[in-house]
Amino acid sequence: MSRLHLHLVSDSTGETLEMVVKAVLAQFEDTEVDRHFWPMVRSRQHLDRIVPEISAHPGLVLFTLVNEETRARLEDHCRQLGLPAVPALDAVTEALEAQLGQEAHGRPGRQHLMDEAYFRRVDAIHYTIAHDDGVGHENWEEADIVLAGVSRTSKTPTSIYLANRGYKTANIPIVIESPPPDALYKLRNPLVIGLTTAPDRLVQIRRNRLLSLHEDTGTSYADDERVRDEVKFARRMFADNGWPVIDVTRRSIEETAAAAIRLLGQRALQLGEHLRVVVELLLVEEARRL
């Protein structure tokens, strides 16, 4: 197994670097990576303090630094140490500059400014936490998305991920013996999405859950036939109500959330087209009256 020391140097929170690294490392198997995280590096003095640590654990240095002096100093140190120093976002930034015909603003952490989008995310997170697992159905109309599914279909983590993207998300478990409230069937604003999965996969997940809680795995919660019935019941409910469905069997939380956002966008386009047709019909009718 290969082993790599990876140094992440950022003049902001480092969240961008972490996401880039996570996406890239997913393409490499049998690799052990020791990550060394160096956020908020905004001065020469701070940079000089971390260089000995980089030297003690030589490897790849990945950075996002907008200050030219700090960046040049890091590259110079790495050159002396014989280590590669890679700017994570240069290619994207340069491509955008070329297309937009303007230079990027050299200010660190601009994506974390407390703008309208920031407060929308905060509001979405508060809403989502307060509407987890079927709670607060009287306020579901305020949601952007409502996720429905049987137990252990990643409803809560997907909801939280969507909230961090700025989408108010409620979720509700589908239980055969406990029908959801009527409010679920009367929603007009939120997009209701059904989450489903392969029954055999769900059985394994539930058994692992019971084992982690030191509980009996022989209960109906993880029984093969019972789980198949639950999944079938939920799928029938989704079909009867015309709700779009996402199969989470082989999807990560991020992939499930991306699929949900895509469905929401498609609905917005459809509603926009529907509104355009309605307006045109009204104009035609008005013209006839005249």
Where are these regions (language model features)?
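N-terminal accessory targeting/assembly segments
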Residues: 1-10, 14-20, 24
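Ser/Thr/Gly-rich flexible loops in soluble cytosolic domains mediating phosphotransfer, phosphorylation
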Residues: 79-120, 226-230, 236
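A glycine- and Lys/Arg-enriched "phosphate-lid" helix/loop adjacent to the NTP-binding pocket
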Residues: 189-229
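NTP-dependent small-molecule kinase module
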Residues: 237-275
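Short beta-strand-centered segment that lines the nucleotide-binding/catalytic pocket of NTP-utilizing
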Residues: 169-180
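N-terminal low-complexity segments that are often proline-rich with Ser/Thr-Pro
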Residues: 11, 270-290
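Internal active-site segments that recognize and position negatively charged phosphoryl groups
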Residues: 122-169
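Metallocofactor- and cofactor-centric catalytic cores in central/energy metabolism, strongly enriched
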Residues: 37-54, 61-65
